[in-house]
Amino acid sequence: MENRTRSAKLMNITAMAAFGTIGYFVAKIPLASEEIAFFRAVIAAVVILAWQLVRGRKFRLPASRKSLILLMASGAMIGFNWIFLLVAYHYTSVSVATLSYYFAPVIVMAACPLLFRERLSLKQIICFACSTAGLVLVISSGGLEGGSSNVTGVGYGLGAAVLYACIILINKSLTGIDGIDRTLLQFLVGLIVMFPYVLFKSGFHVMEAGTVGIMNLLVLGVVHTGIGYCLYFSSLGDLKGQEAAILSYIDPLVACAMSVFVMGEAMGLMQAAGGVMILGFTLYNELGGKTPSHPRQKTGCE
């Protein structure tokens, strides 16, 4: 059992570290954000389907019509969630876009009392207020240090965060479907929805991306999305909910480190302080004596 837990942690950490490097590879793909998102979904869907076939697992749809409709809606949201996040990378630094995006758990925390009649504790209220203050720091410092482009990037990052939060809330009400099956269906719906959008907005120019661009697109689809999500969902069965929630913060930490130390993007003191407040208080909300009843999980959005 101990070996299985150790192996699960290694798979989870590997997936999270990979997710944190997405911005670096996206920067090397000379295509429109919506086209990158579309081909990411296509490649990842093929990889996940192959993974399920190798494991001898049959693809199963949700038993109820309501769950199927919710899954299809969340799949459409994932497509535009990816587009918003990739556009955010274009307008601002990877670190600022990521920190804005990781406001999603705070949105979920605020929405749960309204949707699920869950009462917020004093600790949750404090964490919500401090995380929001951190976001204000990121936004205000972005406007001061990077101009309107930075603020636009934060806006797209928050738009992606709202969609991410909606998908998390939808997934909270879904039962009876495997995590990998759920993600595969969401990706398939996402690419179907994105196809006409890409066709009419920018068209398809993947063959003009060059060898380097296509190689980075393949890495994004195969490694970051296909293999990454297979590793992630395969690890959950042997991890406690709180362990998985805590390990998920490797993703934004790696993303910020890549942004500053590898990509050479600047991060101001106020942005760093705001980022610490967002991630720190969101993580603090996950910690405690009890395992969270609804641990934050990956939903195909990273």
Model-derived features with residue positions:
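Membrane-interface interhelical linkers
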Residues: 1-17, 46-73, 119-125, 143-152, ...
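Specific alpha-helical transmembrane segments that line the substrate/conduction pathway
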Residues: 35, 42-46, 86-117, 160, ...
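Hydrophobic/aromatic residues within transmembrane alpha-helices
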Residues: 29, 36, 40, 88, ...
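Glycine-/small-residue-enriched transmembrane alpha-helix faces in small-molecule transporters
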Residues: 1-44, 76, 84, 146-173, ...
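Hydrophobic/small/kink-forming positions within alpha-helical transmembrane segments
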Residues: 20, 49, 75, 79, ...
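Helix-helix packing/entry segments at the starts of transmembrane helices
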Residues: 97-103, 170-191, 225-261
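Hydrophobic residues within alpha-helical transmembrane segments
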Residues: 10, 14, 39-43, 73-76, ...
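Hydrophobic transmembrane alpha-helices of multi-pass small-molecule transport proteins
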Residues: 48, 52, 72, 120-142, ...
